[in-house]
UniProtKB/Swiss-Prot annotation:
Domain EngA-type G: from-to ranges: 3-166, 211-384
Transmembrane segments annotated in the record for this chain: none
Subunit-structure text: Associates with the 50S ribosomal subunit.
Protein name as catalogued: GTPase Der
Positions of GTP 2 binding: 217-224, 264-268, 329-332
Length: 500
């Protein structure tokens, strides 16, 4: 499972700075959807090949009545369910009572915790860090998040148990030592250029696998009811798969010869046990399920307006590149006028995901639930459809003929060829001159052109642009011997003509 890293600390210690640095956007057109509100509390990040989920728990002030009462419920849940906690303090401001309250809470939890002293650039780092020994965390790590110094080294240590290769011995330290991570050189990796071989490996990995379907949604939209309806219809024996309390339950099932794995984020067990009226909602459990799924089924309550939380969950699914089906639940019993208003609101708020099928269902009565499978299969097939280089290049040239790329610094951008770079989501790699300089509007045009031409439905498309190398770039303007001889002949001919 993808690890979860929680940023914990009082306000203004640099959590947002570190969060923004680690969740930076990439060159690939991932979630450039107008109207999508980006959530600032959680996001996806990557260290080398290791992906992880980053949670900003928000500022915690435990100075008045203790950390238990002042911590938000969701922040507590994030700490409980995270795999690693980065406890951030301000090296310039020094130790505060809020830091002590948070440290007391963290010490009571058996959780890998890294005490991170931030903002140590330009000051005596060791002197600034000395007083934080009082927090009893055994180790102190120094970084400067605003400049990125020490950040990569910190993550290598924090994520070492989850990475294939161990951290370099030089980075390891014993208990009771301060580790100034800013002395190690940090650098930001460019996004890896994807090849056709990468796409083939991706395609082979997806073959003969069941479709992993995650049902997500905010509390009380009917996830539990829908999950039970799906399982009840198929008469599958529901049982708890091995796992920890913070992991979702994976339930194998089959319908019309197609194998599925239902990823249960709502805590559903045997039907007889479902007696809670309020679902326990876990952001982390939901994000993990999205990362592991092939298709995401987002459940929305028809009787309530689309909320920011709905859009946040939707945004995370899009950024993860997952296929998407939307189920508007509790549709039965609504007046026609109300239904029209709901549809109008959906068009207005969700117009940027027009590739996703929307179903109006009643999980309680089963109305429309059967049709969800059709869209789930359609979305998965679209996300894993194998397309050759010749087809992708031909579509690219057709798009170029219909709408020429713009000029960049006085030169026309040239698109040369395209090939597949991956599947689920479908990723198309376009090579050419100055292609990374293309404006977002033209990139979006290409994405929509590919979607229409390939008849892709139910999944986002990613496009990566790679500038082709100039074979004459390193010649420094020097002529070859043949060109030099030709030049001399031309110059000689010009001189002779002038003499006459």
């Amino acid at each position: 499972m993808i690890p979860v890293v929680a940023l914990v600390g009082r306000p203004n210690v640099g959590k947002s700075t570190l969060f923004n640095r680690l969740t930076r956007t990439r060159d690939a057109l991932v979630a450039d959807f107008p109207g999508l509100t980006r959530d600032r509390k959680y996001g996806r990040a990557k260290l080398e090949e290791q992906e992880f989920i980053l949670i900003d728990t928000g500022g915690i002030d435990g100075t008045e009545q203790g950390v238990e009462t002042k911590m938000a419920e969701q922040s507590l849940a994030a700490i409980e369910e995270a795999d690693v906690v980065l406890f951030m303090v301000d090296g310039r401001a020094g130790l505060t009572s809020a830091d002590e309250a948070i440290a007391k809470h963290l010490r009571s939890r058996e959780k890998p915790t890294f005490l991170v002293v931030n903002k140590i650039d330009g000051i005596d780092a060791d002197a600034a860090s000395a007083e934080f020994w009082q927090l009893g965390m055994n180790k102190v790590y120094q970084i400067a998040a605003s400049h990125g110094r020490g950040v990569t080294s910190l993550l290598e240590l924090a994520l070492a148990p989850f990475m294939e290769e161990l951290v370099e011995e030089s980075l390891k330290d014993e208990n009771g030592e301060i580790t100034d991570l800013t002395e190690f050189e940090d650098f930001e990796d460019e996004e890896k250029d994807l090849t056709e071989e990468d796409a083939e490996k991706d395609f082979a990995r997806l073959q003969d696998q069941p479709i992993k379907l995650a049902i997500i949604g905010r509390p009380n939209v009917g996830k539990s009811t829908l999950t039970n309806r799906i399982l009840g219809e198929e008469r599958v024996v529901v049982y708890d798969m091995p796992g920890t309390t913070r992991d979702s339950i994976y339930i194998p099932m089959e319908r019309e010869g197609q194998e599925y794995v239902l990823i249960d984020t709502a805590g559903v067990r045997r039907r007889g046990r479902i007696n809670e009226t309020v679902e326990k909602f876990s952001v982390i459990k939901t994000l993990k399920a999205v990362e592991d799924a092939n298709v995401v089924l987002l459940v929305i309550d028809a009787r309530e307006n689309i909320s920011d939380q709905d859009l946040s969950l939707l945004g995370f699914a899009l950024n993860a590149g997952r296929s998407l089906v939307i189920a508007v639940n509790k549709w039965d019993g609504l007046d026609n006028d109300v239904k029209e208003k709901v549809k109008s609101e959906l068009d207005r708020r969700l117009g940027f995901v027009d590739f996703a099928r929307i179903h109006f269902i009643s999980a309680l009565h089963g109305t429309g639930v059967g049709h969800l499978y059709e869209s789930v299969q359609e979305a998965y097939v679209s996300a894993t459809k194998r397309v050759g280089t010749s087809v992708l290049t031909r579509i690219m040239k057709m798009a170029q003929d219909d709408h020429q790329p713009p000029l960049v610094r006085g030169r026309r951008v040239k698109l040369k060829y395209a090939h597949a770079g991956g599947y689920n989501p479908p990723l198309i790699v376009i090579h050419g001159n100055q292609v990374k300089e293309l404006p977002s509007s033209y990139k979006r045009f290409l994405m929509n052109y590919y979607r229409k031409s390939l008849e892709i439905m139910g999944t986002p498309i990613r496009i990566q642009f790679q500038n082709s190398e100039n074979p004459f770039e390193d010649r420094g303007g020097k002529l070859t011997m043949s060109q030099e001889r030709q030049r001399k002949r031309l110059l000689g001919a010009v001189k002779n003509r002038n003499k006459k």
